[in-house]
Amino acid sequence: MDKFVIRTPRIQNSPKKKLGEKVYKQATIESLKRVVVIEDIKRWKTMLELPDQTKENLVAALQELKKKMPSREVLRSTRIGHAVNKMRRHSDPEVAGLAKEVYTEWKTFIEKHLDRPSIEVRSDPKTESFRKNAQKLLSEALELKMDHLLVENIERETFHLCSRLINGPYRRTVRALVFTLKHRAEIREQVKSGALPVGTFVQTHKK
């Protein structure tokens, strides 16, 4: 009678965490407070400044800004501090209170770290050229000037949803937005009046 050796797989016990052992969480460079993506700062600024903006969007923008500590140079070049300061006088107590927190934290930080610049992340010239062209197409479809805040807000929201890349999805989304704005007057008016939030409008056309 033949004999067979049956090998059973060894069960490897997962290493147990030692009591008191520190658990490290991996962080991306953009999650650090001192790392400031200029594009994000400008996007949040347009969200704060756009007329008839919803409370939810204002709170969302302020909460994101609260996670960052921009340098004096960034505050000056983007004027984001001015936009946040204006929100301190908002009629909604939650928006005004959150804006006050952000403004106070930034002011305190700047006073303590005058000589320590933050790390700035900017787009390259080629990317900016593509985006300017997209803004031109959007402004024509909206029948607004190219430097209108609504045009800027729509383009920045599109760029953000496309992972801040000039890629296929970005180009297709811009084309879809332009087509709708040109050929569907009722949606164009809803976007211009604020009845249709920019975020919702862009999200429904993302390709």
From Swiss-Prot:
Looking at the record's lineage, which domain of life comes first?
Answer: Eukaryota
PROSITE patterns, sorted: TFIIS_CENTRAL, TFIIS_N
Q: Provide the alphabetized UniProt keywords.
A: Acetylation, Nucleus
Q: State its location(s).
A: Nucleus
**InterPro entries named among the record's database cross-references:** TFIIS/CRSP70_N_sub, TFIIS/LEDGF_dom_sf, TFIIS_cen_dom, TFIIS_cen_dom_sf, TFIIS_N
Location, primary (coarse class): nucleus
Any GO CC annotation of this UniProt entry:
nucleus
Database matches in Pfam families: Med26 (PF08711)
PTM sites of type N-acetylmethionine: 1
The UniProt record lists the TFIIS N-terminal domain at 39-113
Gene3D superfamilies, A to Z? Conserved domain common to transcription factors TFIIS, elongin A, CRSP70 (1.20.930.10), Transcription elongation factor S-II, central domain (1.10.472.30)
Q: Which residues form the TFIIS central domain?
A: 130-207
* A Gene Ontology BP annotation from the UniProt entry: DNA-templated transcription
Q: Belongs to which family?
A: Belongs to the TCEANC2 family.
Q: What is this protein called?
A: Transcription elongation factor A N-terminal and central domain-containing protein 2
- Source organism (scientific name): Mus musculus
Q: What broad taxonomic lineage does this protein's source fall under?
A: Eukaryota, Metazoa, Chordata, Craniata, Vertebrata
